[in-house]
Amino acid sequence: KWLFKKAFVLKSQKWGRCMNSKLKTPAVEQLFEAVLSLENKDECFDFFEDVCTINELLSLAQRFEVAKMLREHKTYLDIAEKTGASTATISRVNRSLNYGNDGYDRVFKRLNMLEETEE
């Protein structure tokens, strides 16, 4: 009985992350639909340049690069030197990689972005 309750709580916590009520709003869903409608990189550049500030876009790109480097087992020092990210940002991205919704890893696999370090 205890094991069942523990498993249910763990699943509920995972579902809670996936269905964050603060994030899952009609406005965010509409934004994601807009992103999914883009057909190429040029359209992405146009859209994101209109929607985001340059600093917001650069921050997103930096986090993506940090995540890639963390998955390649680079050190915080190497990552900070290459990307200019603070250790707080690197830690935040690392937490997402380890306890998040697997969004980074899903994209990395689809884009074949990680070096073959497992061999």
Predicted regions and their residues:
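Short alpha-helical "recognition helix" segments of helix-turn-helix
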Residues: D78-T83
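Short, amphipathic alpha-helical "recognition" segments used to contact nucleic acids or chromatin
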Residues: L60-K74
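Intrinsically disordered, low-complexity basic tails/linkers immediately adjacent to helix-turn-helix/homeobox/MYB/SANT
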Residues: V107-E119
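Short, Lys/Arg-enriched anionic-surface-contact patches
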Residues: E43-Q62
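C-terminal structural segments of small proteins and small subunits
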Residues: T87-R110
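Short, charge-rich, low-complexity alpha-helical interaction segments
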Residues: L31-L38
